[in-house]
Amino acid sequence: MPEIEQDDAAAETVDSSTVKFGTPEALEYVRSLTDVGAMTRLLHECIAYQRSLDSDLDTLLSQRTELDRNLVQLQRSAEILDIVKADADHMLGNVRSTCDLADQVSGKVRELDLAQSRVNVTLSRIDAIVERGNCIEGVKTALESEDYESAAKFVQRFLQIDLQYKDSGSDQSEQLHASKEQLEGIAKKKLLAAIDQRDHPTILRFVRLYSPLGMETEGLQLYVGYLKKVIALRGRMEYENVVELMEQGLGQVNFVGCLTNLFKDIVMAIEENDEILRGLCGEDGVAYAICELQEECDLRGSLILKKYMDFRKLAILASDINNSPNLNILPGGASEGPDPREVELYVEEILSLMQLGEDYTEFMVSKIKSLTSVDPELLPTATKAFRNKSFSKAIQDVTRYYVILEGFFMVENVRKAIRIDEHVPDSLTTSMVDDVFYVLQSCLRRAISTSNISSVIAVLSYAGSLLGNDYHEALQQKIREPNLGARLFLGGIGVENTGTEIATALNNMDVSCEYILKLKHEIEEQCTEVFPAPADRERIKSCLSELGELSSTFKQLLNSGMEQLVATVTPRIRPVLDTVATISYELTETEYAENEVNDPWVQRLLHSVETNAAWLQPLMTSNNYDSFLHLIIDFIVKRLEVIMMQKRFSQLGGLQLDRDTRALVSHFSGMTQRTVRDKFARLTQMATILNLEKVSEILDFWGENSGPMTWRLTPAEVRRVLGLRVEFKPESIAALKL
């Protein structure tokens, strides 16, 4: 069975690698071996294992001397350890005795400390009893001598002691409380009497007694009530004085001063009595006083505003303005109604009243916000009291009248400026432009000063309507006049008066576009400062965008008027351009040299432009004159391009075209502040093509080889221009790959 023997040999080989010599398992394994080869291998492994053991034994034996020496040292150390142990036991005994002694001492100390604490408490109680007795005697003595301040201090000190030692001196407490009640009665009686007599020093004396007596809240209420009475009395006197002046029919009734005095009294009452109010109830006392005095402001302030509205008959005036068909903001002529100068006076008065109310409200709200230790719910409550009560509603009524009056004032003055429009010496515009935008600027500034977003939006709407209707119509009027072009060149010569009228009308449009954008920018900046809320800014931005659209509308109107003017001038230039069609560009060297001396057409064209257009320069704004001149240049360039595309050129003719184009660019560049080179780009590129030596040279300038030059001619136009050269063959041009 060879296969079985091989398997046994393999198993023995595998098992021999895991034998651990010196163990019973190894001995059993050796006895089980049957293969000589396995036995031989195991024998060699056993011999190797024996050699490793011999080596380990030699190593251990080499350390014997060192180990013996260490063992001797350990034996000596054992003797020392016995001595150390004895010393340690002795020290442990000492520590234990010391610990026991410390425990005994600390216990005695704790007992002494407890006894001392009890003695101190007892002494404190004795001192308290003595001091309570002193307080009782002090109160009685102070009351007898009417030294109420000292009596209040004694009461306060007694109450503090009584709060600390609640279980002692009930008899003393009864005596003190009797004296306290007596002092409270005296303080209240004296305070009420002083309030009735408005004896301020006495009021201050007795209201200060309420805090040490623990009656802070009652004292605060009485003192703030006194302040309200004083303010009410002064406010009533001011109001009655105003009513008396009204009944006497006197025109100068100072409502602004009356309201100012009311606000001043309230603010001074808060500021000057801050210490008293804080002494009674801290910052809560200040907040309480502000809210209480605001009630007086609501009462007196709303009465003043209502009386002002009655005095100026604002309701009737507003009704007349709203109901009159001549006073609405639609295109129209002169209106009949209130005198705008009186209305402006009313507007200024209303603005003063509104500004006073806003300043007062902002001050008082900021005063409340500065109080850090008050109830967090007090701030929104107080703010609501300022924003939603009767005075605030009266301000809203006045604001509505302001918007109506401001709108009327704006409409009347803008229409008046349009009606009395006249030429201003040494000015390029008529009086209407500056006058109208001054009125709009003034009215919008006033509206912003109200800090009322609705007022600003309404006045902005008025301004936009006026500019889009009345003012727009006034700007168009001159341009729409019939036969304006015919009158511009009567007898073949530019008529200065007509030119001035046309130029001024166009200048009005140009300057108006600029003024609208300036006004828009100014209003936007001011509103950004006054109205920080994002929602308010969005509303204003929406209204201002309409002003921007009006500027674009005026710009379109200006362009239309400018085109009409150019259409009047260009027929006088066209004859010179028509002569260019008769001039040959198939030049010989002699003809080219002759043209250099005697220009065939460029100078005549420039002279025609100077004669028919340049005389308008001093009459126009620089922007308008540049636009006017550029429109003429556009006309000239387009006509020249058409003419040149119909000609035939020699190479010298191409040079002549380049020279002519350069002369035009140079001259026109001196006439205008804007660049004109781009307008002649196509002609310049035509001249470049016509100057080439051969057709293929165009590839040096085309496509990737064009460099910084941008081609204005299409590939088809380039082929057409190449075809204008008499020397170039059509088949060469057709072969070009552009």
From Swiss-Prot:
Organism domain of life: Eukaryota
GO BP: protein transport
Membrane topology: Peripheral membrane protein
Pfam assignment, any one: COG4_N
Compartment(s) where it occurs, according to its Swiss-Prot or TrEMBL record: Golgi apparatus membrane
Keywords: Golgi apparatus, Membrane, Protein transport, Transport
Principal localisation: Golgi
InterPro entries in UniProt: COG4, COG4_C, COG4_M, COG4_N
Keyword Transcription tagged: no
GO CC aspect terms: Golgi membrane
Function: Required for normal Golgi function.
Self-association and partners: Component of the conserved oligomeric Golgi complex which is composed of eight different subunits and is required for normal Golgi morphology and localization. Interacts with COG2 and COG3.
Family named by the database record: Belongs to the COG4 family.
Protein name, as recorded: Conserved oligomeric Golgi complex subunit 4
Naturally occurring in which organism (per UniProt): Arabidopsis thaliana (Mouse-ear cress)
High-level lineage: Eukaryota, Viridiplantae, Streptophyta, Embryophyta, Tracheophyta
